[in-house]
Design a protein with these regions (language model features):
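Peripheral, non-AAA+ core regions of ATP-driven protein-machinery
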Residues: 1-128, 132-138, 176
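Generic secondary-structure signature for well-ordered alpha-helical cores
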Residues: 3, 77-81, 122-126, 146-149, ...
Length: 210
């Protein structure tokens, strides 16, 4: 007991998975947790370093990323300063919106299929591709995200929260800047499609939101 001086504790929310060696492992849902911490009036939130960029998307609250429990104890005892993680949300969001590894413009021919994909992309419709192996279904589907309308900042926040709760965000990731594109196989289970399970998780329908 008495490892930490209690006067600071009620001003901060702390989240993380503590390993036996004292290191902190990343968690799911850092973004919605940070939003709730701000709503509840916390001065700051302390999370594993891998979650810091994700949580720092939320403004008006200090976000600190730490490697281990020792850093947290020394911070609360005034022996170590922690540097808050700062993200220029708008700048980062718009800078990443137009970068795609695969481009729809690379596809030659297939005019009828391309037209169908363009209509689906513009109207936000679902689409199913049926054809013989090697006919270009996967190649076309992988390039569809490059013609989807850009996300708004509000849509990006909604989408990032869902993927955060599902544990789908990569470490050291901020806002999702491109529309999610999901291509489930026809053998997918009902739970995987709609969500649920013993430990409920968002399904493909939720992951495709926006």
């Amino acid at each position: 007991g008495e490892v930490i001086q209690p006067d600071k504790l009620n001003r901060y929310l702390m989240m993380g998975e503590l390993s036996l060696d004292g290191s902190l492992q990343p968690i799911k849902g850092a973004l919605p947790i940070a939003i709730k911490a701000r709503e509840l009036g916390f001065e700051g939130i302390i999370v594993p370093r891998q979650n810091a960029l994700e949580a720092a998307v939320v403004n008006q609250i200090q976000v600190y990323g730490v490697e281990n429990i020792k850093e947290v104890i020394e911070f609360f005892n005034g022996k170590q300063e922690l540097t808050p993680t700062i993200v220029n949300t708008r700048e980062e969001f718009y800078a990443q919106q137009s970068s795609f590894d695969l481009d729809f413009a690379d596809v030659k021919g297939q005019e009828n299929v391309k037209r169908a994909l363009e209509v689906a992309a513009a109207g936000g419709h679902n689409i199913i591709l049926i054809g013989a192996p090697g006919s270009g279904k996967s190649m076309l589907a992988k390039r569809l995200p490059s013609i989807l309308p850009p996300l708004s900042l509000g849509e990006s926040l909604e989408t990032t929260k869902i993927h955060s709760v599902a544990g789908r965000l990569q470490n050291n990731t901020g806002l999702i800047s491109k529309r999610p594109f999901r291509d489930p196989h026809h053998t997918i289970s009902t739970v995987a499609m709609t969500g649920g399970g013993s430990y409920p998780q968002p399904g493909e329908i939720s992951l495709a939101h926006n």
